[in-house]
Every structure is written in C-alpha cells, then in structure tokens.
C-alpha cells in the first residue's frame, strides 16, 4: 500500500503573546517626503487595489449565463458587491458569489479577521436574492505564511473560528 509508507507530518504549535511596538507619528516634513511611497503602499492593499486575482478566475462570458459580474464598467473594475451566474437558460436558479477579505485586521487579530471576512462576504451577498441561508456555501482559501510554530498556532486558531462561525450559521465549506 503506497499511502501507508509515507510519514505523517506533525506540527509544533505554540501560542505566544503578541507585542506591538509603539507607532510614532511622522513630523510634517517626513509626511510630505513619504507621501508618494505611502500612496503606493495604500494602493497595493487588497482592500484598495485590484481584486482581479479573486474576481477573474473563470471565463465569465462565453456561456451567456452571467447576469452580473463583480467587475463593472469600461475599466472592468471589481466594484460590485456580488456576481450572479444563472444555472441554465431555462431556470430562475442562479449562483451568487460574494467576497470577504480583511487582511489588515489579520495583522492585529487573525481570529477577528476571519469573522469579519465572513461577515463582509454575507453583507456583500445580501443584495442578491437568497431564499434561505441554508443555500449558502463557502469556499475557503487559506493563504497563510505558516513558517513557524506561532504561525501554525494562528492558522489553527483561525480555522477553528471559521468552523465555529459557519456551524452556528449553518453554512458549509464545500471547496
């Protein structure tokens, strides 16, 4: 049996206290000098910059079933809260997709970040017609550095929180 010959991977998970250093405010002169750099940093944030890596994963037009895309307008910007794709030309059923992401909050509190991300996803989808929360399914994407025992702990704690919230809501992760 091929699978029995592989060693099981084990993780050393350790919790530690996170200490944030005091953040000094820059002087007026420093603010003016750093403005272009700061602006570039702001536009590189997922919450502000392009979400094309999230919204352009599939061919959205060939089948003719796309009712609304998350990217809108002549510049194809991801401005819509949700997208809608019909199941067929002969049915009223459709799939609504919404995205929730809160990366900056994850720096301070990863567990709070996952709850806020789920809340954002549901709030974005509320504008589509959903008959019952039982019809909502999630797709989880764990993009985590996972390089040391503390990162393992944060990932484990965050996944536990996702599980707790989705079980309370009756929502499954199916991919």
State the predicted function of each range.
Residues 1-175:
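Glycine/proline-enriched, intrinsically flexible loops and inter-domain linkers
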């Amino acid at each position: 049996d091929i699978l029995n010959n592989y060693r099981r991977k084990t993780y050393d998970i350790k919790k530690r206290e996170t200490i944030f250093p005091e953040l000094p405010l820059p002087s007026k002169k420093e603010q003016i000098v750093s403005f272009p750099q700061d602006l570039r940093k702001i536009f590189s944030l997922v919450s502000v910059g392009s979400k094309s890596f999230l919204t352009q994963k599939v061919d959205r037009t060939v089948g003719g079933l796309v009712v609304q895309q998350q990217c809108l307008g002549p510049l194809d910007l991801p401005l819509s809260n949700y997208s809608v794709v019909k199941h067929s030309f002969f049915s009223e059923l459709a799939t609504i997709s919404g995205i929730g992401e809160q990366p900056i909050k994850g720096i301070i509190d990863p567990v709070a970040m996952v709850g806020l991300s789920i809340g954002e996803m549901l709030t974005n989808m509320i504008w589509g017609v959903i008959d019952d929360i039982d019809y909502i399914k999630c797709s989880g994407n764990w993009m985590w550095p996972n390089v040391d025992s503390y990162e393992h702990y944060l990932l484990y704690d965050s996944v536990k929180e996702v599980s707790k919230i989705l079980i309370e809501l009756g929502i499954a992760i199916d991919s």
